[in-house]
Amino acid sequence: MNANSIFLCFFIMLIGCTLTHSCPSGCYCDQVDGNKCRPEEGTNPHLCLGKYCKTPDSSSVITGNQDEKTQAKG
């Protein structure tokens, strides 16, 4: 594999991650601010910049039961 195909594979993986409902590692889902990904403390803000998250059920408002900010990120 040359560097281009490795980069392309990584890029496709990045695109795939943005289409899912979760933010990149080190970012959390800010549902109050339009489902934008926000950096956790100590995370490079550019990692989360321009990324959005979709809640599993976007028609219902989540009230503390499933707050993504409190869940531990692997």
UniProtKB/Swiss-Prot annotation:
PTM info: Contains 3 disulfide bonds.
Q: Where in the cell is it found?
A: Secreted
Q: Which GO terms describe its cellular component?
A: extracellular region
Q: Which GO terms describe its molecular function?
A: toxin activity
Q: Name the tissues where it is expressed.
A: Expressed by the venom gland.
Please indicate which superkingdom the organism of origin belongs to.
Answer: Eukaryota
Task: Decide whether keyword Disulfide bond is in the record.
Answer: yes
Q: Which residues form the signal peptide?
A: 1-22
Entry keywords, A to Z: Disulfide bond, Secreted, Signal, Toxin
Give the UniProt family note. Belongs to the scoloptoxin-09 family.
| Name by which UniProt lists this protein | U-scoloptoxin(09)-Sm3a
